[in-house]
Regions:
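Glycine- and acidic-residue-biased ligand/ion/polar-headgroup-sensing regions
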Residues: 24, 29-42, 48-49, 78-79
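Boundary at the C-terminal end of the N-terminal hydrophobic targeting segment
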Residues: 1-2
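Feature responds to low-complexity, polar/acidic, surface-exposed segments characteristic
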Residues: 81-165, 174-194, 200-239, 252-291
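Short acidic-glycine-tyrosine-enriched beta hairpin
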Residues: 46-61
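Ligand-binding loop in jelly-roll beta-barrel domains
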Residues: 66-82
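Extracellular beta-strand scaffolds
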Residues: 19, 34-36, 44, 52, ...
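Conserved short histidine dyad/triad with adjacent acidic residue
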Residues: 10-21
């Protein structure tokens, strides 16, 4: 049913979710891809003072107003989005992959942390992950973050900021990464689907740094039982985002490590999180896996 937000209210949504409302509803897209649909009347981009056409994609950080004599539907067209809105509205969820719930679930067991972005819980699911963010997730999935944070070993990379020095030093000492050049890690470069899938294969002991060609990492992950065929296709079909890092990491936890139990079993045994905390985190996600 319809609800009223008397002040701007924020929601993190997933693909296919719809926010709708009548005349007077104001909407700001804080992140992600969203379009607007309406059959009559007008929707105004208040930021530019212009009307937008039905079916148009909306610009981030512009304020949109549903004008007279219409009801507008704001639909999430990307994997995720963050909307801020004020006025009379209804939210209609779609049965799509719930990346936001997976991010929240991983946060409860300390495997995923937000950035200092002031919206969307800092999850930044709409952004491409950096190579450093991918490396830190690998270290967490290995259950080795506490060791990494106390590492004072040498690392040769000139482009690593102070806060990331322990992670880079630890990963270099353990042979987890060689950087993009002898003295460059590529800290702020985007991580690819192939790179992150290769990291997962290493965490699950199906690969190692001896594997230098990572171009077929998703396919190798499929043959190892780490990814489904649908997941390989999805990774190949769209830009790789932090939403995908969350998804792959979430399902890696229920995957068997080469020669042993599941990755979650390994992390529980290492004391990274408890069995009860893990079970509670899984209960937070109700969407289905991509087949």
């Amino acid at each position: 049913g319809a609800q009223r937000a008397d002040v701007f209210t924020e929601s993190r949504l997933k693909q296919g979710d719809m926010l709708s409302g009548p005349t007077g509803l104001q909407v700001i897209v804080l992140a992600g891809n969203v379009n607007v649909q309406f059959s009559s009347g007008a929707v105004i981009d208040v930021t530019t003072g212009s009307e937008v056409s039905s079916g148009a994609s909306l610009a981030e950080n512009h304020r949109y107003l549903v004008a007279e004599d219409t009801t507008a539907l704001f639909a999430v067209t990307g994997k995720t989005a963050v909307l801020s809105y004020c006025g009379l509205y209804s939210l209609s969820p779609a049965p799509s992959v719930d990346y936001p719930a997976m991010a929240a679930a991983l946060k409860t067991i300390s495997l995923f942390r937000g950035s200092d972005t002031g919206y969307g819980e800092g999850f930044d699911l709409e952004k491409a992950p950096t190579r450093m963010e991918a490396l830190i997730m690998l270290i967490r999935l290995l259950g080795e973050e506490s060791e990494a944070l106390t590492c004072t070993a040498y690392q040769p990379f000139a482009d690593v900021p102070d806060w990331a020095e322990p992670y880079a030093a630890y990963a270099y000492a353990k042979g987890y990464t060689n950087g993009v050049e002898p003295t460059m890690f590529g800290t702020t470069m985007s991580a690819s689907a192939e790179m992150y899938t290769e990291f997962l294969l290493r965490a699950l002991r199906y690969s190692s740094t001896a594997q230098t060609d990572i171009s077929n990492a998703p396919e190798r992950a499929y043959f190892a039982g780490v990814l489904t065929s649908g997941e390989v296709s999805a990774l190949r079909a769209s830009a790789f985002l932090r939403a995908d890092v969350v998804y792959l990491s979430y399902y890696a936890l229920e995957t068997n490590v080469n020669g042993g139990g599941t990755l979650s079993d390994v992390l529980i045994a290492r004391g990274v999180f408890s069995d009860a905390a893990y079970r509670a985190s899984r209960a937070m996600v109700s969407s289905a896996r991509i087949g």
